[in-house]
Amino acid sequence: SIDHNQSQSETDEKSIEVKLSATPAILGKTLKEDTSLISDASKFSQILKKEFEIVNFAEKIKKLLQKIEIRKIFICLDDCSELDQEALDMFVRTIVAPLHNDSDGFFRFKIAFYPERNTLPDIDRSKIDTYMLDYYHLYKSSGADKVEEQAISYVKRLIRQRIKHYFNESNVSDIESTLFDTKPMSIDDYYKLIFYIASSIPRNIGKVLFYAERKSISQGKPITKTVLQESSEEQYENDISPILTKDEFFQYKSYGENFKRSQLLSLMNKIIEKAKENKQKIGTSNSNIFKDYTTSNAPSHYLFIKRENELFLSTLEINFFITRISEQKDKGDYKNNKFISNDIIVYTINYGLCQKENIIYDKPNNRKYRIERLFDYNKLIEEWVNNSA
């Protein structure tokens, strides 16, 4: 965060103390009266814009750059979601919006946000391009049956490009067979497993391969399926679980989050408990769709909710406790002598968490499997909300 105190000497009329921090504030004091704390970001940003004259400053820079025939400036802002909502709101109002709204578009912004942790005040969203980079939204236009295929292809291309770069080898297949034990399992199955573990997120792919390297390659052994599974659990324990279990700053909660860390931990524990119960139910079920499973191999990592309950899971989703894999219709509720389908979102529980809790993570070929009624978590979510209020 930024902590900075700036005081103006008292004049006959007023003195102002400005404090910039993770939760900016203005303290104003006149000779006649003390004013109360002003937390409205728009008022504060108006003061900053007048003080720093960002538009005039940018105009001078633009004229200088145009003299050397520079026509556009692209400003890339990464990890803006690390700011709290008030600070981000103020930054956008003060810096981004005035430059973005410039009539000739000389300054162009590319801004990275986490879902549910973004705000763009004073900017018309209908006039900007927005790209969702989670694999479901990125590839869903290819068709529901192609989403996973496209995401796995991305993982494969990403890793193979890294192999080409770091090993300077044209024969990538030889390097792959050296890094991975391809005797019991094909290289494509390894890429599929890495996709399940990391959900096509480059940072998570890098982390799980880092843990895998320490367990295998650094000891002169190739990466195996078991190594990747153990690494997924280690990554979960080290990088994801502490978000709900440690007392450190809870950085990536949704801006609309109304529940405490302890309450979200309770929700996650309830999800885990139900997944374990579902594993037993599937393994002992007489239903035809579950006939190939026992209590030791029944996949129970799915859950789905109605779209109106999405907000309650947003913080868990952006922190990778769960991952969205589909938006579709459920089997429906029986009303007025007919079944009426609901719009639902289907998630999977984090692969490393499944390893830790002995929840079977698998991908049955039957797409109807994941919307079986036992994966309906709406009642669980609604009861948790009522008990947490």
What are the functions of these language-model segments?
Residues I61-L64, V96-L99, K192-F195, H301, ...:
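Generic recognition of flexible, low-complexity loop/linker segments
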Residues M90, Q150, Y154, D189, ...:
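Generic recognition of stable, solvent-exposed alpha-helical segments in well-folded globular domains
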Residues S42-I187, S232:
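The catalytic "switch" region of P-loop NTPases
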Residues T178-Y196, V208-Y211:
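A long, hydrophobic alpha-helical segment
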